C-alpha cells in the first residue's frame, strides 16, 4: 500500500460489492486525494451453493480467501458482513473498524402474504439459516422450511418463480441493494432475534499497518462496535459460526448494554433464552455471561447435535 492508495478485498456478490463501495466512498470522503480500488474475489461459501451452510461446515466460509489476500499483501483491507466474520483471526490480522449498523432485523418477503401470521398452514418458507428456521418453527410449526441459498437477487428470483410462498432475508441487505420495497414486513427482534453482528459491516486489516488504522478511524462507529463486541463474545463462548442456531442482539440503554441471546433446536421444539445488562466497558464480559447462562440451560447439547450432523467439530 502506498500512502495514498488502499486496495479492498471483497466478495463478488452484489451486497458485498455494495459494502466495499460504501467503504471506498467513506474513505475517499474522509481523505481527499486517497485512491481506493476494489479487488473482487470468490469465497468458498460462494462456490458451494448446493448445500445448506450448516452441512458445509467450518468457519470463515466467506472470509478466508479475503484474509489470504491480506496476508500475501495483495490487498490492504477486507470488508465483511459482520455476521460472517469468525471470532478468531489469523496471526497478523485483526478487526479494526465496525461501521454504523443498518436495520438488524429479519425481513419477511412474499408476493402473496403480508406477514408471517398470514401464511396458511403448510406454506413453504425459504431460508438458509438454522437460526431463522428454529425461531420460525417455534412460532409456526405448521410451516414447511425449505433450503434457500444464493445471493439476494437469486433468492428473490426463486421466490418470484413460485418455489416458495415466502422467504426470510436480512433487512439490511435488501435495503442496501435498493429492494426495500420487497419487504412486506420486518420481523421484530422479539419474534426473530438476529444473528450476532447482523446489519453491521466490519473492516479487517493487518495488525502492523498502524498508518492504515488511522485512515480507517473516521469510519468506526463506537456504539455499533460496543453492541457487536457483546454479541461476538457470546458467539465465541458458544463456539458459534454463522451457520448454527445461535441468535444474539445488544442495544445500548444510556450507559449500559442490554444483550439477549438464544440457542434453538433447528426443528423449533426448544428455544433457550438468556439476557443480561452491564456497563458499556464490560461488553465482552456481558457476552460471556449471557452465553454461560445459555450453556447452563443445555445449549451445548443442542449445538453439538447440529455440529455432529454437519460432520465437523
UniProtKB/Swiss-Prot annotation:
Instruction: Supply one GO BP term.
Output: protoporphyrinogen IX biosynthetic process
Spell out the disulfide connections.
none
GO CC terms on record? cytoplasm
Q: Which InterPro entries did the record assign?
A: HemC, Porphobilin_deaminase_cofac_BS, Porphobilin_deaminase_N, Porphobilinogen_deaminase_C, Porphobilinogen_deaminase_C_sf
- Pathway, per UniProt? Porphyrin-containing compound metabolism; protoporphyrin-IX biosynthesis; coproporphyrinogen-III from 5-aminolevulinate: step 2/4
- How the cofactor binds, per note? Binds 1 dipyrromethane group covalently.
Annotated keywords = Porphyrin biosynthesis, Transferase
- What's one Pfam family here? Porphobil_deamC
Top-level taxon of origin: Bacteria
The answer to keyword rRNA-binding applying to this record is: no
Q: Which reactions fall under this protein's catalytic activity?
A: 4 porphobilinogen + H2O = hydroxymethylbilane + 4 NH4(+)
SUPFAM superfamilies annotated for this entry?
Periplasmic binding protein-like II, Porphobilinogen deaminase (hydroxymethylbilane synthase), C-terminal domain
Residues bearing S-(dipyrrolylmethanemethyl)cysteine? 242
The residue range of the signal peptide is none
Tell me the GO molecular function terms. hydroxymethylbilane synthase activity
Write down the EC number.
Answer: 2.5.1.61
Per the entry, which co-factors are needed? dipyrromethane
Record NCBIfam families: hemC
User: Miscellaneous notes for this chain?
Assistant: The porphobilinogen subunits are added to the dipyrromethane group.
The UniProt family comment states: Belongs to the HMBS family.
Per UniProt, subunit arrangement is: Monomer.
- What is this protein's function per UniProt? Tetrapolymerization of the monopyrrole PBG into the hydroxymethylbilane pre-uroporphyrinogen in several discrete steps.
Name used for this protein in its record: Porphobilinogen deaminase
Amino acid at each position: 500500500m502506498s500512502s495514498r492508495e488502499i486496495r479492498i478485498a471483497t466478495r463478488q456478490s452484489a451486497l458485498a460489492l455494495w459494502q466495499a463501495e460504501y467503504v471506498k466512498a467513506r474513505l475517499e470522503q474522509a481523505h481527499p486525494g486517497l485512491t481506493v480500488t476494489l479487488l473482487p474475489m470468490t469465497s468458498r461459501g460462494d462456490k458451494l451453493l448446493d448445500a445448506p451452510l450448516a452441512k458445509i461446515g467450518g468457519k470463515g466460509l466467506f472470509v478466508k480467501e479475503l484474509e489470504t489476500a491480506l496476508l500475501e499483501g495483495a490487498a490492504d483491507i477486507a470488508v465483511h458482513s459482520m455476521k460472517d466474520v469468525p471470532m478468531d483471526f489469523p496471526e497478523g490480522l485483526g478487526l479494526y473498524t465496525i461501521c454504523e449498523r443498518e436495520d438488524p432485523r429479519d425481513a419477511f418477503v412474499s408476493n402473496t402474504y403480508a406477514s408471517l401470521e398470514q401464511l396458511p398452514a403448510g406454506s413453504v418458507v425459504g431460508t438458509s439459516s438454522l437460526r431463522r428456521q428454529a425461531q420460525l418453527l417455534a412460532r409456526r410449526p405448521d410451516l414447511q422450511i425449505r433450503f434457500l441459498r444464493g445471493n439476494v437477487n437469486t433468492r428473490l428470483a426463486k421466490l418470484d418463480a413460485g418455489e416458495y410462498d415466502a422467504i426470510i432475508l436480512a433487512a439490511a441487505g435488501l435495503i442496501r441493494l435498493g429492494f426495500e420495497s420487497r419487504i412486506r414486513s420486518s420481523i421484530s427482534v422479539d419474534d426473530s432475534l438476529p444473528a450476532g453482528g447482523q446489519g453491521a459491516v466490519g473492516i479487517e486489516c493487518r495488525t502492523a499497518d498502524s498508518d492504515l488504522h488511522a485512515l480507517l478511524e473516521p469510519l468506526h462507529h463506537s456504539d455499533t462496535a460496543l453492541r457487536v463486541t457483546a454479541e461476538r463474545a457470546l458467539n465465541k463462548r458458544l463456539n458459534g459460526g454463522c451457520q448454527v442456531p445461535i441468535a444474539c442482539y445488544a442495544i445500548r440503554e444510556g450507559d449500559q448494554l442490554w444483550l439477549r441471546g438464544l440457542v434453538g433446536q433447528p426443528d423449533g421444539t426448544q428455544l433457550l433464552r438468556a439476557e443480561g445488562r452491564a456497563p458499556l466497558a464490560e461488553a465482552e464480559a456481558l457476552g460471556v455471561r449471557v452465553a454461560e447462562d445459555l450453556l447452563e440451560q443445555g445449549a451445548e447439547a443442542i449445538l453439538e447435535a447440529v455440529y455432529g450432523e454437519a460432520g465437523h467439530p
